From Swiss-Prot:
Organism of derivation: Herpetosiphon aurantiacus (strain ATCC 23779 / DSM 785 / 114-95)
Gene: hrcA
Annotated protein name in UniProt: Heat-inducible transcription repressor HrcA
The family this protein is said to belong to: Belongs to the HrcA family.
GO BP: any one term: negative regulation of DNA-templated transcription
Top-level taxon: Bacteria
């Protein structure tokens, strides 16, 4: 946001926003005069100028001032102090993730819980996903004479399982050979490409058996279903932390928050933007394209492996959010998740930038 403010006005704006974030109460000039070392009249004049600039507003003629969305934006971009997590907090978070470093599905739930606790507001996390789901490998495991377990592993680490009917005479050794052939045919392929393999067999390859076609079609279908269920992949935590804020004292606001977090579709609209962006994204109040989110601020960051597999971590809260702490928390958790992804894939991780 490009707006020139002299040093005194910057100090007044910063003080108003910090006090309003702490108290949720409009700020009067006499509240700031002593801490800023100037008279109440001087503070009133500066507040009036900041209101004329669209950075502050007031609810009633005699009431104190509170920030506008533009005021919060100026604060985030120009005034706020860094609020890095303490060394003790960082070590505790790293230890928690280290204990489940090989359990990708548990990372997501832990990330949401840790972020909610650290930022003291609602947290949202999506699992790492390839920009387009890609096949990594399958295993075929004999269950009994009539059933085979298909285990599908996608490149981003997701695992899908289903049972398939099998010929009673098929041995585990034969199943392993079939899995090996399909792994070669489908290496790094998308769902669409795998579906084509089943229906357009190459003349350069031995023909596929009916069971191999069944397996390949099942793989393609599972990958397509995975790509279609985005809503179910947004995990959240911290509803109670968020509802402790005074903005959510009314039942209608509680229902609104539940709709945003449980419904998923409103937050889902923000995920593609976060996946396509570098660094931490801060969206404040009226900057949202959806009316339902205009009383909220959202802070999001991408994590994962560059150019390949990525997810999103973030927080949702009132516009009166503790931005320095929330931004640092999101950035740190995104960095931890990227480290885990880099270790898992042995590839270049995404570094959350400033």
């Amino acid at each position: 946001m490009h707006l020139e403010l002299n040093e005194r006005r910057r100090r007044v704006l910063k003080a108003v926003i910090q006090q309003y974030i702490d108290t949720a109460t409009p700020v009067a000039s006499q509240d700031l005069a002593r801490s800023l070392g100037v008279s109440s009249a001087t503070v009133r004049n500066e507040m009036a100028a900041l209101e004329d600039a669209g950075l502050l507003t007031h609810l009633h003629t005699s009431a104190g001032r509170l920030p506008t969305d533009a005021g919060y934006r100026f604060f985030v971009e120009n005034l706020m102090d860094r609020a890095a997590l303490s060394t003790q907090e960082q070590r505790m978070i790293q230890h928690q993730f280290y204990q489940i470093r090989s359990e990708l599905n548990q990372w997501i739930h832990l990330a949401a819980a840790v972020l909610a606790r650290t930022a003291q507001t609602a947290a949202v996390v999506t699992p790492p996903r390839a920009y387009e789901s890609r096949f990594k490998h399958i295993e075929l495991i004999s269950i009994n004479d009539a059933l085979v377990l298909l285990v599908l592993v996608l490149h981003e680490g997701s695992v899908k399982q289903q049972t398939l009917p099998a010929d009673p005479n098929t041995t585990q050794e034969q199943l392993s050979r079939i899995a090996g052939r399909i792994n070669e045919l489908c290496h790094e392929a998308s769902a669409k490409a795998i579906a084509n393999i089943a229906h357009n067999q190459s003349t350069n390859q031995p023909p596929l058996s009916s069971f191999e076609v069944l397996v390949i079609e099942s793989v393609a279908r599972a990958m397509q279903q995975f790509e279609e269920h985005v809503n179910e992949l947004i995990h959240h935590d911290g509803l109670l932390e968020m509802l402790h804020q005074p903005e959510f004292g009314q039942v209608t606001r509680v229902r609104e928050v539940l709709s945003i977090l449980e419904g998923g579709t409103m937050l889902e609209s923000l995920i593609p933007q976060a996946l396509a962006s570098d660094g931490v994204q801060v969206i404040i109040g009226g900057e949202h394209s959806r009316d339902e989110l205009r009383d909220y601020s959202v802070i999001l960051s991408r994590y994962g492996v560059n150019g390949d597999v990525a997810g999103v971590v973030g927080v949702l809260g009132p516009r009166r959010m503790a931005y320095p702490r929330s931004i640092s928390s999101v950035r740190y958790i995104a960095g931890v998740m990227s480290d885990l992804m880099g270790d898992l894939y042995g590839e270049r991780k995404i570094e959350p930038s400033e």
